[in-house]
Amino acid sequence: MTVAEAETYWTALAGLPRPTLKELFSDAGRLDRYAATLDLPGGPIRFDWSKTHLSAEVEAVFAALASAMDFEGRRAALIEGAKINNTEGRAAEHTAQRGIGNEASVEEAEALHARMRMLVDAIHAGALGEVRSLIHIGIGGSALGPALAIDALTRDGAKVAVHVVSNIDGCALEAAMKACDPATTMIAVASKTFTTTETMTNAASALEWLRENGVADPYGQVVALTAAPEKAVEWGVDETRVLPFSETVGGRYSLWSSIGFPVAMALGWEGFAAFLDGAAAIDRHFIDADLAGNVVVRAAFADLYYTQVRGCQTRAVFAYDERLALLPDYLQQLEMESNGKRVLADGSPLTRPSAPVTWGGVGTDAQHAVFQLLHQGTHLIPVDFLAVKTQGHDLDPAHHQILLSNCFAQGAALMAGKASDDGARAYPGDRPSATILCDDLNPATLGALIAFHEHRTFVSAVMLGINPFDQFGVELGKAIAKQIESGGGEGFDPSTEALLAAVGLAG
């Protein structure tokens, strides 16, 4: 379909009536239509999009656009392992890591998982000596996913204490090393290419730390997680400690591959397997459910409606559970690196807004920081609230009751608003929100939540006609940084040259 042909659907959406949320709720069946509970391996998850401006009329146009953009064909291509990452000539086979995909790719993933399990089980059994800590070194997709999963799922303890280090700032690695005993610490080096500057610099420093602290064979305590195993071996890692993953698994979609090694180390293999099972359950829902009952598709339709029709430039995500504190950061990369594009998949200009800015925080902290703008500011910002029915601590249940009360109150207040003769105390209301309520937070639940957002991001990309699986926008800055590091700090604009001179990096 051409850009001009797609534009007719966007024009139709823009021309539809815009009833308020209160008016939409005059339909007694609205809640049943826009809230759904999925029974998943980790327990039920409720997806409630009733407080958004989605309507039967809006969804009908989106369904027609989805058909015109060959959504079903693109979804099938994703699952079957077709080369849908056309700019790099690759498939995007993260679902195969969860057992959903073409037979050959699933078998390859299962073999790699079996290899990973053998190593994880051996370490936990003490076959490699005493291992109390793991410093996991990666960046971007090699770090954000493991950090989220470990922070969310090990608050009650872990089989091995995992410290995720991503920043090139030495303060990050130094803090991790201070918390570990070199004699009982393993180092995991996670890099798809095994050339990432930040990761390899941190890895070299970690090796030196082991060496300086009396470890006779530092490489004996290193595991490599990479799609370039030959480079890991060349760097010095024993071949038996290299856990490869397929080139067709993108970095920000790689948590399900050997990049999940630190998660398995922390949880044990059963926990990691449950994590995969939860994600696979969402895969099956995404594949099998029709558009009207597909919670993934509905979420993407809402995202697109607010960005493309209502002109919203951001969307906010607030986790009303401390264990999900890192989820907004994870979603920032997933959504903005995937869909923050300026061209269509065929290279022609994208004439509509691409991904909104994704941001957020943790409730109730965020209420005392940014909710003033959400309720009374001039920006319309759709909000996602995430909450967990079962508390994650042993303190007085009043803590959790207050937490959930605040979560649900915010959604109600955004919608209802409050009139006042004093403008400073008036709330306009009619501000959209969606709520995702998990019965419990466990490995399977978290896997389901992440897979839900992966597919949500993919649907938005299909509807816009863009490729969500490349990320060339990150390359220019890295190339310039390497130029500066090699002494080429000349030929820049006056501001950059002055900054380089101020820190002694001028050429």
From Swiss-Prot:
Example of a GO MF term: glucose-6-phosphate isomerase activity
Signal sequence coordinates: none
State the organism of origin.
Novosphingobium aromaticivorans (strain ATCC 700278 / DSM 12444 / CCUG 56034 / CIP 105152 / NBRC 16084 / F199)
The family annotation for this protein states: Belongs to the GPI family.
Q: In which pathway does it act?
A: Carbohydrate biosynthesis; gluconeogenesis; Carbohydrate degradation; glycolysis; D-glyceraldehyde 3-phosphate and glycerone phosphate from D-glucose: step 2/4
Q: What does this protein do?
A: Catalyzes the reversible isomerization of glucose-6-phosphate to fructose-6-phosphate.
Q: What is this protein called?
A: Glucose-6-phosphate isomerase
User: Where in the cell is the protein located?
Assistant: Cytoplasm
Per the UniProt record, which EC number(s) apply here? 5.3.1.9
- What keywords are assigned to this protein? Cytoplasm, Gluconeogenesis, Glycolysis, Isomerase
